[in-house]
Amino acid sequence: MIIEELHIVNFKSIAAADCRFSPKVNCLVGNNGMGKTNLLDALHFLSFCRSHLSVPDNMVVRHGEEMALLQGLYRDESGDGIELLLSIRPGKHKVLRRNKKEYERLSDHIGRFPLVIVSPQDYQLILGGSDERRRFMDQQLCQQDPRYLSALIQYNRHLQQRNTMLKQDRHDDALMDVLELQMGSYAAEICNKRSRFIEDFLPVFNDLYSDISGSAEKVSLSYRSHLADGIPLEELLRRSRPKDYLLGFSSCGVHKDELEMLLGGVLIRKIGSEGQNKTFLISMKLAQFRHQQLHGDETPILLLDDIFDKLDATRVERIIRLVGGNGFGQIFITDTNRKNLDEIIASWSEDYRLFKIENGQIFQ
């Protein structure tokens, strides 16, 4: 999958832009705060109908404007052209059209235009709470498996309903029994698929970390779930119900799962240096790309947002050699330093385009 053209109106700091991209390498250069990340976020929005930066929709519409528009012209691996048109109005439902036909449900779009982004904000994957790591697993699985996406939506809907009931003065145990049984069914599917995903993902991640770091450091991932002991969630929820009534929320379930990230058998967030954390993160995201490529119908678009800062020259060279090789499709790279991008371009024989970003304006 590649994007050939992107047209932007009133998205964040970008008032208007018309971009035509290389099918291989696209380099964006500009100082911080000029709009490089906003352009990448527009690409992310077209794939996932939300910002990579987890900001609400009303914050992506340019200040003082009523609506933002994003239009992308794509070409899939069979050679077919596809137009996406997304309109965003504060306080309104987003409207997404594919070849002029509106999606009835935005969830039907997820996974059809695969994209992987590596950015400084991804540090929360290592340093943040467990919800960040669950989101990583969910994003990957939702792109590949519509049944997983459906199970996750239903589980979260029932979880919200249970939490509402836990806050009520009147306790309806019969209704709670039914609700927990339904949650147990969805949770079993979610847990099983998360577990299998990590089993498939781990060898790919290990190989990439070794390639980038050039060291024998042992890294690993460990999936932890309340369901790991084989007790159905409905039974766990029934047992925890008295405590949950006191707490006012559901204290167990797959919404509490954890993905432990380990360096030498110890949580990397406790011992990792800045360089080790960044190498771990980039390896995770490139493994996400590889896994999506292996299990999906289309090669994802890869966005690399200011990833070379805090890395030594040897690791930068290894990453460049890795993503510049066969198997990676269309790539977008941002940097504040034109010299860095020139060195990257010089090391590749691929077709490329260079864009300069200044105050929300894009020059080619």
Swiss-Prot record:
<keyword id="KW-0963">Cytoplasm</keyword>
<dbReference type="GO" id="GO:0009432">
    <property type="term" value="P:SOS response"/>
</dbReference>
<dbReference type="GO" id="GO:0006302">
    <property type="term" value="P:double-strand break repair"/>
</dbReference>
<protein>
    <recommendedName>
        <fullName>DNA replication and repair protein RecF</fullName>
    </recommendedName>
</protein>
<dbReference type="GO" id="GO:0005737">
    <property type="term" value="C:cytoplasm"/>
</dbReference>
<dbReference type="GO" id="GO:0006260">
    <property type="term" value="P:DNA replication"/>
</dbReference>
<dbReference type="GO" id="GO:0003697">
    <property type="term" value="F:single-stranded DNA binding"/>
</dbReference>
<keyword id="KW-0235">DNA replication</keyword>
<dbReference type="InterPro" id="IPR001238">
    <property type="entry name" value="DNA-binding_RecF"/>
</dbReference>
<dbReference type="GO" id="GO:0000731">
    <property type="term" value="P:DNA synthesis involved in DNA repair"/>
</dbReference>
<keyword id="KW-0067">ATP-binding</keyword>
<keyword id="KW-0547">Nucleotide-binding</keyword>
<keyword id="KW-0238">DNA-binding</keyword>
<dbReference type="GO" id="GO:0005524">
    <property type="term" value="F:ATP binding"/>
</dbReference>
<dbReference type="InterPro" id="IPR003395">
    <property type="entry name" value="RecF/RecN/SMC_N"/>
</dbReference>
<dbReference type="InterPro" id="IPR027417">
    <property type="entry name" value="P-loop_NTPase"/>
</dbReference>
<comment type="similarity">
    <text>Belongs to the RecF family.</text>
</comment>
<feature type="binding site">
    <location>
        <begin position="30"/>
        <end position="37"/>
    </location>
    <ligand>
        <name>ATP</name>
    </ligand>
</feature>
<dbReference type="InterPro" id="IPR042174">
    <property type="entry name" value="RecF_2"/>
</dbReference>
<keyword id="KW-0742">SOS response</keyword>
<keyword id="KW-0227">DNA damage</keyword>
<dbReference type="Pfam" id="PF02463">
    <property type="entry name" value="SMC_N"/>
</dbReference>
<dbReference type="InterPro" id="IPR018078">
    <property type="entry name" value="DNA-binding_RecF_CS"/>
</dbReference>
<keyword id="KW-0234">DNA repair</keyword>
<comment type="function">
    <text>The RecF protein is involved in DNA metabolism; it is required for DNA replication and normal SOS inducibility. RecF binds preferentially to single-stranded, linear DNA. It also seems to bind ATP.</text>
</comment>
